[in-house]
């Protein structure tokens, strides 16, 4: 029997990946997943992956009518957590619903919960990126795994901050318009400020993890579904070469330095790399930095990185479970276990 039992509340883009990631670990298990709609994902969860399925009380009849087997209600499993052996809920519900679930379910039941980056930072005691502040989440009741963009920036900037003295950071975020399965979002023929205000919210979100970094961000949305891209400018307070930066990234966890010149010149080709590596759902958990973009000029570092928005936060959720339950106090040991189970690599197999 696994050491920790986990309920994934919300089985969509992130939730289904977190469920599979938890299921792959030796020291934790999936107690169940929660769905609100009796769709193909719910059917796959039960019939293909064998996950116990829980649903809201007011949706039970819909699942019965659809012929999808359920194990009970989400209200019952959370509010009777001890009876079910539930240790942690990973809340992967849409923005704002997690905070409501905390108030109506998790706090009432005294159950630990992890939230995603769409929630406000105030929902949790800690905003979390394993490489940056794992120890802060040890024993915490509520943790927020920050957004895909924030996670990516924390990984690369955190690596740089460990090695070099940094000044101001400026980032332009080029956001994908929607995930591949989403048909109700856009734009499909425009570039849109998102948000139109500068600075954007991404910089302050990075500071919830790395409070002493000086960062300003701006963001736009473009008509693509595959990945985000960041153009990063970092003022340096010491002499650093491009090779120093490449070495730092290559030594870091969950960051790949990839060669633009070997047919990896776009986000489409990076996603194809994920497919060719045999990754499930072509997931790229790692942040991919183009080697040729890394340049230091007049005391300023520039680089570009690509972010698979569906996947990069998944390892963080697993590490957060270990930290909160104190399964593992050493961040490196937790990340070793997570990465081994998921096939996360610290350098591309190129």
UniProtKB/Swiss-Prot annotation:
Q: Which CDD domains match?
A: GAPDH_II_C (cd18127), GAPDH_II_N (cd02278)
> Biological process GO annotation list?
glycolytic process
Keywords on record:
Cytoplasm, Glycolysis, NAD, NADP, Oxidoreductase
Instruction: Identify the enzyme class.
Output: oxidoreductase
- What name does the UniProt record give this protein? Glyceraldehyde-3-phosphate dehydrogenase
* Binding-site list for D-glyceraldehyde 3-phosphate: 147-149, 202-203
Disulphide bridges in this chain? none
Q: Which organism is it from?
A: Methanopyrus kandleri (strain AV19 / DSM 6324 / JCM 9639 / NBRC 100938)
Q: Does the keyword NAD apply?
A: yes
Q: How does it assemble?
A: Homotetramer.
- Subcellular location, record wording: Cytoplasm
Q: Which GO terms describe its cellular component?
A: cytoplasm
What PROSITE patterns does this protein map onto? GAPDH (PS00071)
Q: Where is this region: Disordered?
A: 327-350
Task: Specify which residues bind NAD(+) according to the UniProt entry for this protein.
Answer: 13-14, 118, 176, 309
The superkingdom listed in its UniProt entry is Archaea
Q: Does the keyword Oxidoreductase apply?
A: yes
What's the Enzyme Commission number for this chain? Answer: 1.2.1.59
Locate the active site.
148
């Amino acid at each position: 029997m696994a050491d920790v039992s986990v309920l994934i509340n919300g089985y969509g883009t992130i939730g289904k990946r977190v469920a599979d990631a938890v299921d792959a670990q030796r020291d934790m298990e999936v107690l169940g997943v929660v769905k609100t709609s009796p769709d193909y994902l719910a059917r796959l969860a039960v019939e293909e992956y064998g996950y116990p399925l829980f649903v809201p009380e007011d949706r039970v009849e819909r699942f019965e009518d659809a012929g999808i087997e359920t194990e009970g209600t989400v209200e019952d499993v959370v509010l009777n957590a001890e009876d079910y052996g539930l240790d942690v809920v990973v809340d992967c519900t849409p923005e704002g619903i997690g905070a409501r679930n905390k108030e109506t379910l998790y706090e009432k039941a005294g159950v630990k919960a992890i939230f995603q980056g769409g929630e406000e930072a105030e929902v949790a005691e800690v905003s979390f990126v394993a490489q940056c502040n794992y120890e802060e989440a040890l024993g915490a009741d509520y943790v927020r795994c920050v957004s895909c963009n924030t996670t990516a920036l924390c990984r690369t900037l955190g690596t740089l901050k460990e090695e070099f003295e940094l000044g101001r950071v400026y980032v332009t975020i080029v956001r994908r318009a929607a995930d591949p399965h989403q048909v109700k979002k856009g734009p499909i023929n425009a570039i849109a400020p998102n948000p139109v205000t500068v600075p954007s919210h991404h910089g302050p979100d990075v500071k919830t993890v790395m409070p002493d970094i000086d960062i300003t961000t701006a963001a736009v949305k473009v008509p693509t579904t595959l990945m985000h891209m960041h153009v990063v400018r970092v003022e340096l307070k010491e002499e650093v070469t491009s090779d120093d930066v490449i070495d730092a990234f290559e030594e870091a966890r969950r960051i790949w330095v990839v060669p633009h010149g070997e047919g990896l010149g776009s986000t489409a080709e990076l996603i194809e790399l994920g497919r060719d590596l045999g990754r499930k759902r072509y997931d790229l958990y790692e942040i991919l930095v183009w080697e040729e973009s890394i340049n230091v000029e007049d005391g300023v570092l520039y680089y570009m990185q690509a972010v698979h928005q569906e996947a990069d936060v998944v390892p963080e959720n697993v590490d957060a479970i270990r930290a909160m339950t104190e399964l593992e106090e050493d961040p490196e040991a937790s990340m070793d276990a997570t990465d081994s189970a998921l096939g996360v690599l610290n350098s591309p197999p190129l």
